From Swiss-Prot:
The keyword Cell membrane applies. Its main location: membrane. It catalyses: L-serine(in) + Na(+)(in) = L-serine(out) + Na(+)(out); L-threonine(in) + Na(+)(in) = L-threonine(out) + Na(+)(out). It is a multi-pass membrane protein. HAMAP family: Ser_Thr_transp_SstT (MF_01582). GO terms for cellular component: plasma membrane. It comes from the Bacteria. Keywords: Amino-acid transport, Cell membrane, Membrane, Symport, Transmembrane, Transmembrane helix, Transport. Coiled coil: none annotated. It is found in: Cell membrane. This is Serine/threonine transporter SstT. The chain crosses the membrane at residues 17-37, 44-64, 78-98, 138-158, 179-199, 212-232, 295-315, 336-356. Belongs to the dicarboxylate/amino acid:cation symporter (DAACS) (TC 2.A.23) family.
Amino acid sequence: MKRFISAWNRTSLIKRIAIGVVIGAILGLLIPKITVIGLLGDMFVGGLKAIAPLLVSALVANALSQTREGQQSNMKTIIVLYLFGTFAAALTAVISHYIFPISLKLGATSATKAAAPQGVGEVFKDLMLKMVDNPINALSQANYIGVLLWAVVFGFAMRTASEHTKELLHTLSEVTSQIVRWIINLAPFGILGLVFDTISKNGVGVLADYGVLILVLVGTMTFVALVINPIIAFVMMGKNPFPLVFRSLKDSRITAFFTRSSAANIPVNLQLCEDLGLNPDTYSVSIPLGSTINMAGAAVTINVLTLAAVTTLGIEVDFATAFILSVVSTISACGASGIAGGSLLLVPVACSLFGISNDLAMQVVGVGFIVGVIQDSCETALNSSTDVLFTAVAEKSRWKKS
């Protein structure tokens, strides 16, 4: 038994999740009536539901509190590029939804009719009311819009606080992230239960739906990396951006793909910036900041999964509402890339815009974890490589103007 536990701990999380997917599928086919196996998935999703509101609050507030006033203009350009690039990726995901609409196989509760908003006006009204909710109530009721708003307010207010106070907030963020890491380490068992429950109820045909979901996610992220980001870079630099784009992808994406954490990839990106001859005073700030707020891949994941849930429930979405969704996903993604699987925990924030219950939203998160072996790796590769790309683009753009 000790040998088994030791070997299990030495195996990467990606491989363990893959093992869980295979075992869950086999058990779902062979013994579909042993429903107690599905309890593993319910417990896993329950743990995520419990920690998700606090995670959003802590990560966003900490990220914003660390930004400093009076940064040189080059740093401001980088931050604008980070936010605009994330928003552009979110809009790309919306467009891909209209071209390749997909639906998900959710549990029995998905039959419950969601309160579909009647156009952008109602969405805006609900958004405003949720934003001013009591922060404690927002945390306890999983009102992610309220959680996000108050996290932003506290984060900006903390910018002028003492370093000791900021350190307390940073510690809270680290502790919350550690709890999430513990839960994520149980993902193989949770995924086993989720796959078992899905296969036992819907059969192997549901795997085709997951295949389409993976193709849409990865295809959209690839389009952002090879089309959207180069367009942004060309506009800023006025010259061929692809040598810089490919250098960023080549040197940053491999480690990011396997660590599935932009935070863990910071040393690699710092070395790459040094190799590119960039200003260390700039990239020493922009790369760590980018690992927290530069979230193109996360925005794609949030929008694709949310709009898939919306399609599944038969909710009509006009482009104006989808535009608001892109704004919300851009803001809510702040802090997601610092931990493995973080963007999936922010899907309920976007789902709440459409009146989708937290229970249904967490089922969508469960689907995200099933495809997460590929999704999270590709997402992090896009996020992390873009940190370097936009840092370099901002600096080269400044040289062009000088």
